[in-house]
């Protein structure tokens, strides 16, 4: 909490890295930024290692041929904690099959997800088409026409909720 003293936070292991960064920032903002980026990169590597949808650098759950019969259905926009599970911080994947008519194949497709909390990578037919960091930023992506197919296409969004409420939550 914002009113918790530094002395109290020193006894909470989860705050050790951030307290170190804040103390460094008092004298060397560049060093603090480097420490923050290293801490964040380590955290992302830990999260990616736990993500069953990733196999190394391959987003296997973005594969349009993936069998998702056992996946649960949900509606968006909604926070993950309200629509799926109350205690999730981490990665969750969303998929939607979209049927495109032949007349749509001549131009790039524009996708607007609205805001996503906190980060996302958007795939179309297994190919990444956009990525955004920031919890309150509208997502606007362009799908090149060479990725479009007549009939079924698959939109996949990997959402990384870093804490608090998360998900695809705003109006698109």
Regions found by a protein language model. Name each.
Residues 67, 92-94, 118, 137, ...:
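Residues that flank catalytic or metal-binding motifs in active/ligand-binding sites
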Residues 78-84, 89-92:
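Alpha/beta-hydrolase fold catalytic core
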Residues 88-101, 139-141:
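Short beta-strands within extracellular/lumenal beta-sheet-rich domains
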Residues 60-61, 71, 98, 103-126, ...:
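Aromatic-lined ligand-binding clefts that engage carbohydrates, nucleic acids, or primary amines
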Residues 1-79, 135, 145-172:
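An acidic-aromatic loop/edge-strand motif
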């Amino acid at each position: 909490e914002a009113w918790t003293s530094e002395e109290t936070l020193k006894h909470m292991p989860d705050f050790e890295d951030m307290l170190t960064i804040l103390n460094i920032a008092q004298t060397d903002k560049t060093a603090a930024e480097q420490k923050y980026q290293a801490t964040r990169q380590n955290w992302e590597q830990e999260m990616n290692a736990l993500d069953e949808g990733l196999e190394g650098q391959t987003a296997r759950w973005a594969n349009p041929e993936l069998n998702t019969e056992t996946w649960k259905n949900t509606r968006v926009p909604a926070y993950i904690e309200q629509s799926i599970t109350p205690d999730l911080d981490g990665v969750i994947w969303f998929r939607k099959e979209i049927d495109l008519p032949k007349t749509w194949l001549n131009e790039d497709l524009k996708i607007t997800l609205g805001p996503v909390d906190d980060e996302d990578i958007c795939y179309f037919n297994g190919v990444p088409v956009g990525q955004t960091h920031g919890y309150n930023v509208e997502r606007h992506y362009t799908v090149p026409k060479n990725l479009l197919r007549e009939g079924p296409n698959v939109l996949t969004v990997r959402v990384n909720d870093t804490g608090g409420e998360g998900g695809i939550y705003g109006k698109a």
